[in-house]
């Protein structure tokens, strides 16, 4: 099993690479790519960690060497948020990066599963889809927007608020991966009751948690370490499913035939070909139904923006 991380020299990429080096199954290959010249050095640094994961690093303008033979590609390349920016402000730079890297994946590893971390995910995933379609290699089962950060934040915040073990907390998160398009289904958390006020406050905190980190870092970065952990959780789940492990479910932003939008985040059963089945997300509370319906205009606009970017 070969996993490639594109954007591996950045804050998310290095955290992700560390977690993959220590947690990928024995015998895996881990390939790191970034335009930054430090990237081969990041690989050397990680190579000193005693795990049975082979690692190589590549720098420069062409990621081809990193992508050859890749089964999974995780893309975190791009610029990060700074104070005063929202995820859509990143679009102008990151859209072009994703377009180029998706094109390289289509050319070098057309059968790989691709997980996109680069924001704005609501838009960068449709960009990748359009590029793969143009190349004639699009398989909607193999393209994912990684929204796991919303899930782990939800789990953490619910556990802290209610004083319950994280082992007992599961929070499905549906919709998209920015602002009001992030919808944690708090009504589905087992064994916990929330007041109406708690639901409103907790939903808002989860939706704005990225801004919380950006402001706390005072211009020094965005959520890199928690995002690295979230991407590792998703990537490792995907690897296990590709290797035949059954019953692995993660929430992720996919082209899954949703009645709401072309791309929509919801629970997905992973399998040997990527998405095995897009799962129903169950009954919503009145608050959640209203929030879902209210987000759709923005989510659809984000998707259209990506499609039009590739169409030119």
Swiss-Prot record:
It catalyses: (S)-malate + NAD(+) = oxaloacetate + NADH + H(+). The keyword Amino-acid biosynthesis does not apply. The keyword NAD applies. Its EC number is 1.1.1.37. The active site is at 177 (proton acceptor). GO terms for biological process: malate metabolic process; tricarboxylic acid cycle. One of its GO terms (cellular component) is cytoplasm. One of its GO terms (molecular function) is L-malate dehydrogenase (NAD+) activity. Optimum temperature is 35 degrees Celsius. Substrate binds at residues 81, 87, 119, 153. Belongs to the LDH/MDH superfamily. MDH type 1 family. NCBIfam families: MDH_euk_gproteo (TIGR01772). Catalyzes the reversible oxidation of malate to oxaloacetate. This is Malate dehydrogenase. The gene is mdh.
């Amino acid at each position: 099993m070969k996993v490639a991380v594109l954007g591996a020299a950045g804050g998310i990429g290095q955290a992700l690479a560390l977690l993959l080096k220590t947690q990928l199954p024995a015998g895996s290959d881990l390939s790191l790519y970034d335009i930054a010249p430090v990237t081969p050095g990041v690989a050397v640094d990680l190579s000193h960690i005693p795990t049975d994961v082979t690692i190589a690093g590549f720098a420069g303008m062409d990621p081809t060497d990193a992508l050859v033979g890749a089964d999974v590609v995780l893309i975190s390349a791009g610029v990060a948020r700074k104070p005063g920016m929202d995820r859509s402000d990143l679009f102008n730079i990151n859209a072009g990066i994703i377009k180029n890297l998706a094109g390289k994946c289509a050319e070098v590893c057309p059968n790989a599963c691709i997980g996109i971390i680069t924001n704005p995910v609501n838009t960068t995933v449709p960009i990748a889809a359009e590029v793969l379609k143009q190349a004639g290699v699009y398989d909607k089962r193999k393209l994912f927007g990684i929204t796991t950060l919303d899930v782990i934040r939800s789990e953490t915040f619910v556990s802290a608020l209610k004083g319950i073990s994280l082992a007992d907390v599961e929070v499905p998160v549906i919709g998209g991966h920015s602002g009001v398009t992030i919808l944690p289904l708090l009504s589905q958390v087992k064994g916990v009751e929330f007041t109406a006020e708690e639901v409103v406050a907790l939903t808002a905190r989860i939706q704005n948690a990225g801004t919380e980190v950006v402001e706390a870092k005072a211009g020094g970065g965005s959520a890199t370490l928690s995002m690295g952990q979230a991407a590792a959780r998703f990537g490792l789940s995907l690897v296990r499913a590709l290797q035949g492990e059954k019953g692995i479910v993660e929430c992720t932003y996919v082209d899954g035939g949703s009645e709401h939008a072309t791309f929509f985040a919801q629970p997905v059963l992973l399998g040997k070909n990527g998405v095995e089945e897009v799962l129903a997300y169950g009954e919503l509370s009145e608050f959640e139904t209203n929030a879902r319906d209210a987000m759709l205009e923005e989510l659809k606009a984000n998707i259209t923006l990506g499609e039009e970017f590739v169409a030119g």
